[in-house]
Amino acid sequence: MRFIPYGNRRVTRWSDDAHSEVVMDRYEGKRINRPNDVVCKSDGSIWFTDPGLRVPLADKDLPHSGVYSVKPDGTSRLVAEFEYPNGLAFSPDERTLYVANTRHAQYIHAIELDTTGNMVRRRIFADMSSEETDGVPDGMKVDVEGRVYCTGPGGTWVFAPDGAKIGVIRTPEVPANLAFGGPDLKTMFFTARTSVYTLRSKVPGQPHPWYRVRAK
């Protein structure tokens, strides 16, 4: 399955045989603004950010930006409102959802969830404010040991599970997004303005719920 969350004010699911299905395009009867990033949970639910990027104010049906979830039965809910939510990723145990806020207060928020997916607590996980002007908190991934990787000012920032900053991965261009790939999920891919860069990691990325890592 492929999820296309950007550009047409809806989240669309595409299967390998080119069949498409609209996952969500409205909340409480109003058109969502412009979804940005999407992740899936092992229970089959789909979670995405909607910062309303480049939607004229007059065209916005919903006054807020936020994080939404959609259950397999199609039931949707607003998980939390944000100023400008962008990348998001689950912790390995799926008890915490990390969300990057791109503008002004450049924080990664940690949303702690109960077993039903409701927010029980929200806190600041990491501060990505920087004097570097190239790059903002954007794409995000987590590895199997719980480290959080987020593209941002100057490169890809790496945080320990407790929020402590480990360092910054520098690439020739500042990337906007990243992914773990390859048969063992130890190849990191960084997408930037003109190129895609790769780096081998000692630790595999957290697999998607439907992905099985091939052991070596």
Regions found by a protein language model. Name each.
Residues 3-4, 48-62, 199-202:
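Short, conserved, GDST-rich strand-edge loop motifs in beta-rich repeat architectures
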Residues 1, 11, 67, 97, ...:
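Hydrophobic beta-strand positions in blades of beta-propellers and related beta-sheet-rich domains
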Residues 110-118, 200-208:
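Short loop/turn segments immediately following beta-strands, especially the blade-tip
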Residues 8, 62-65, 105-107, 119:
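A detector of repeated loop/turn-to-beta-strand junctions in beta-rich toroidal repeat architectures
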